[in-house]
Amino acid sequence: MSTPTAKHPFSRLPLPPTTEISQHNLTRIDPSLPSGENPHVSQRRSKTFPKAGHWAKVTPLPIAFPYRLPRADASKGETQLGIEEWLQDWDTFQEEANDEAAGVQARVSERRSKLSPELIGLSATCINDVLPHLDVGNALAYTGVSETDDQPEKLDEAGQDLVDCVSGKKVISGQVEGKEYVPYASRYAGHQFGVWAGQLGDGRATSILETKTADGKRQEIQLKGSGRTPFSRSADGLAVLRSGVREFLCAEAMAALNIPTSRALSLSTFPLQQLQVIRENGPEPSSVLARVAPTFLRIGSFEILNPPEEARHMQFFMLGMASGGQGEDSSLQRDWEGLRILGEWVAGPAGLALGLKEGEAWGKKLVMEVATRNAKMVAAWQVYGFCHGVINTDNVSVLGITIDYGPYAFMDVYDPFHICNHSDHEGRYDYRKQPTMIMYAITSLVNSLAEVIGCEEQVLSGKAISSGWAEGVDEEALEEWGRVGADFGKEVERSVMETFKAEYKKLYLQRFGLRTEKDDDLPIIVDSFLNILAMHELDFHASFRVLSAFKPSMIPNSDSTDSSQKEAFESFLERMAECIPKKPTDQKKSEVKQSFRPWLKTYAKRVTEEDQQWQTALENDQDWQEARCEEMRKVNPRFVLRQWLLEETIKKLEEGEGLERRRVLAHILKVRFVSAA
């Protein structure tokens, strides 16, 4: 009998040991404050840090920007606050009684205590899958996820603790094994649409907590839309409700499809009179998304530490952006020591868990593991018609999980050239090119670690680099190490292509209900089917769902006199023809049927080759064809997160209130995702 999992309120979730806490192992950015600048101002002021580490302390602060300071009433003897004093008031915390077993406390200031966040979304599957030790109190019932006879109108203590923390109202901080523990934003760079974009970083995301489950799995919880950070540039660091809804639903939809992804724990908003987010079309409701992943480090986290040559001679002058201190050179510089520290962390137990021996070289293995994971991830994207929309190198995870849901879309009509991002005028990130763009990102990782790989191979003979590994090394030697690393990139590219093709084929064969692999399955079964979809502009997802009802026994023999068999086949063809999104003409339906007739006969023959395998695995004389259809339905869901549904959901959330609004997301998560098969 298994022992029940111990539950903890959010603010008391157990932290990992300090050896697995990212901020205790990666380098904190020294803000290099200009003389007289207040640290509370500094954490909100955008800066380019030429060579400054991996992360910067910043508390979540979901308030409007530009900041609006209250005007003092001179008649009452009030003194006008300056920006430093005003921001300091937000983070002058009142100590709260709390169990210190977790080593941290949830803290609130007088100003923060006036914030009134509302929890409008909570994912039970996220909790069950990755945070089974989290006690959310009555929050699931409050948001309508779990139905009870008495629907609570207020959150209980654990539920309120959750919303206070995941909305950014309260700040989790304290001491862990004698070391400070604070919220932070990560520093990274990236190539955007193929062009070096310089320092980017978490402009509207704050990592607030790391925790470890009873079975040893580490998770990081990050708030998106929680206010300005040192990487916000001229932006406000906030998120509108529609963007929060899109990521909340898509992350959980991807998880339901078994596509590697970050997870969405919760979605919060604030009353309009308290916070409105100003965008192109005027004020909009806000959102703060709590998302979860083992780490949110990405390929851009490495690029910032070893930027391409042109970046090392590029000055950054941007609206709202200051240099990294006393007005010094703001071009990015190589940080060899920071590169080593980050690489060791990512290769270790808290990252990829490569299982390296003491002193074993990690450069090649890290790159190959990141490449393999991302190749499998993008294969799943292709098989399920998911278009990310903006595969910049700063949006590609080192874990090979889908992150940063922006202008994404699941294709409706099957179109290899589908572009979901209206800003992608040249189609760089269209559906067909997604594997190539992932390879581009992996190549950027190879370039960032090229000198590490070269040094470990040429100089250290398979041993890992150590502290000071590039200190005093001349440029000629560095270039030679870089060439060795770049040559390894060719091997990585071959591996990515092979891994992608194998995973792509495996996942598609699952969707086609095939248990074995044959060399010609891709061209004969998969590609031929997709060509029919493209030729007739059929709905990608509906076509697979209908195909899940196909049985080889539907194919009539040429000499058969069984009219029911012929009727079943014609009825099935009719259903396939109805997968045209717009009401098809009889002529169009006839063309679709004619295209499918020969393909279905070939498909039926291929399926029948596996009848013995199916029959052997069955019990109680179950019909193998029906059992196969059941398996296909599990991987070809009837529910897909389509754009019209997102728009309809967002409208309901923007216009609704109270329990009715909270039930909107709960209904989709529960009815649509759970019952997807």
Identify what each model region corresponds to.
Residues 244, 274, 281-388, 401-524, ...:
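ATP-dependent phospho-/nucleotidyl transfer catalytic cores
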Residues 105, 112-356, 399-401, 441, ...:
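Conserved ATP-binding subdomain of kinase catalytic cores across diverse folds
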Residues 259, 386, 657-658:
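Residue-level recognition of short, well-ordered coil/turn positions
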Residues 1-186, 434-677:
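Regulatory N- and C-terminal appendages and interdomain linkers associated
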Residues 94-101, 219-230, 343-347, 351, ...:
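Active-site-adjacent bridging/hinge elements
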Residues 389-398:
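Hydrophobic residue at the +6 position relative to the catalytic HRD Asp in the kinase catalytic loop
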